[in-house]
A protein has these predicted regions:
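Short, flexible, basic/aromatic active-site loop/helix in glycosyltransferases
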Residues: 30, 34-65, 69-70
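Active-site donor/metal-binding and catalytic loop motifs
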Residues: 106-128, 141
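Short glycine/proline- and charge-enriched loop/turn segments
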Residues: 44-51, 77-79, 119-128
């Protein structure tokens, strides 16, 4: 549970009660109250009955209840989250590995949450956090694609994004938009580091 998540009165109780009822699950999650940005994904579109628990392919990492016993039986090395990923897509990676083991992931509609996201960050640190977010998103996206689809696929997917980021970086430099230029510079830098198999080393400067 991330610190930028707000709970409703029965969020935890309903989630735990449903976990006891379901039993046969690897991961379950509460449901976001923001329907425009759901905290789950389903590969094959289908009608969803929001009055009962439903199975999904992936849930966002800011609220997950893991069936530790089942997960440990699946991953003998006891590595749940990929520790090479500092930020972004670690939940996608875990969910993908869970589904590859034919295990189940559920959303519990009676357990609601509100995700604040960037709104949970102090204005004093907003710029540094935004730069960090852009760096790590680019790094993690390439790493995830490389891990699950291969280096060449990740490269073909990443090179156009690298070119786009560099063009935007130079454009914003020319028109003296300093912060915007830094954003796209960090996007490019995160991607380049991932392409070169370097670690996700970047950290925001919030001293």
């Amino acid at each position: 549970l991330n610190p930028d998540v707000l709970l409703f009165k029965d969020t935890i109780d309903n989630l735990i009660n449903e976990a006891k009822q379901l039993r046969n699950f690897a991961i379950i999650s509460s449901i976001s109250d923001n329907k425009e940005f759901p905290n789950f994904s389903i590969k094959k579109k289908r009608h969803i009955d929001y009055k009962k628990n439903f199975e999904v392919d992936c849930v966002d990492g800011y609220c997950m209840l893991i069936n530790k016993k089942k997960i440990k039986s699946m991953f003998k090395d006891n590595i749940f989250f990929d520790e090479k990923i500092f930020m972004y897509l670690e939940n996608d990676d875990l969910c993908k590995r869970v589904k590859e083991q034919n295990e189940k992931i559920f959303i519990v509609p009676t357990s609601k949450i509100k995700h604040l996201g960037a709104r949970g960050v102090s204005n004093n640190f907003h710029s540094e956090v935004e730069l960090s977010r852009n760096w790590h998103w680019s790094w993690s996206k390439f790493y995830y694609s490389k891990k699950h689809k291969g280096y060449l696929y990740a490269l073909a997917e990443g090179l156009p994004k690298l070119v786009s980021s560099m063009i935007k970086f130079f454009f914003y430099c020319i028109i003296f938009k300093k912060f915007k230029s830094k954003v796209y510079y960090n996007r490019a830098l995160g991607l380049i580091n991932s392409m070169l198999n370097r670690s996700s080393w970047y950290r925001p400067k919030i001293d």
